[in-house]
From Swiss-Prot:
Sequence repeats lie at residues 7-10, 15-18, 20-23, 29-32, 59-62, 71-74, 83-86, 97-100. Keywords: Cuticle, Repeat. It comes from the Eukaryota. It comes from Locusta migratoria. One of its GO terms (molecular function) is structural constituent of cuticle. This is Cuticle protein 10.6.
Length: 109
């Protein structure tokens, strides 16, 4: 994975329904959610690791619940987002993704 821009293709990048199924099993991983809400560490390495784990916690549930099978922003509450970016850069016309590090709400417009 990587820190900026769109969600890593292995997880959700432009995820079509056919690609959504493999990550759906991770959708309710409690340990990942717990790590995602942990305080931001001072170590850049830990920040990177947590951001990757948080991407599973936030992007995977969206893949499991979004009506169109796309990776919608945090927890899948946005109906028509194209791909849930890792750090909150959303498609403005469809919804914004909550940042991966500890924010649990999507801003839906």
């Amino acid at each position: 994975g990587y820190l900026g821009g769109y969600a890593a293709p292995a997880y959700a990048g432009y995820a079509a329904p056919a690609y959504a199924a493999p990550v759906a099993a991770v959708a309710h991983a409690a340990p990942a959610v717990a790590v995602a809400h942990a305080p931001v560490p001072s170590s850049a390495a830990n920040t990177y690791r947590i951001s990757q784990t948080a991407r599973l916690a936030y992007a995977a549930p969206a893949v499991a619940h979004a009506p169109l099978g796309y990776a919608a922003p945090a927890y899948g509450v946005a109906r028509y987002a194209a791909a849930a970016p890792a750090l909150g850069y959303g498609y403005g016309a469809y919804g914004y993704a909550a940042p991966a590090l500890g924010y649990g709400h999507a801003l839906v417009h």
